[in-house]
């Protein structure tokens, strides 16, 4: 038998989900203006966006309709009008808007390296990381990503694809996440690292 508290929590969750779905539906109805110097091509639910900062291609499930009308991208649910289609089209609209922004102005993530002897440098299409291990770490830089290294300890990851920029940033950080005692490692600029006191020997 459900308690009053459980019933209340279920009602709150349902209300929250309904509110989020309505918000995404409102977002989905908003056209996406195509800026100057940006080209959008749509073929069989695959969207290609090109601009000054590069190009991004993504394929979406055929539960939404994507069209260009009056130099704007319009996203709408497919004719079956399923609950999934109605829930998805706001998300698809947000992703495409992010693609347009990415090729127009780009996305960036900044990292910093802390630790004695820890540093990074570029070797062609590879990032060379010295992070206190017995061997350097060589990471291939994917197409569509630019990495800049300043003074060996400051890195900037740039690209038109927001998801790819985030993935590359996360990979670099994963090689030596900031440890909580001395704080050394690779961290995203602005990241808060919870520090711990080291154990003392009696």
Language model: regions and residue ranges:
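N-terminal intrinsically disordered, cationic/polar leader segments
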Residues: 17-170, 174-202
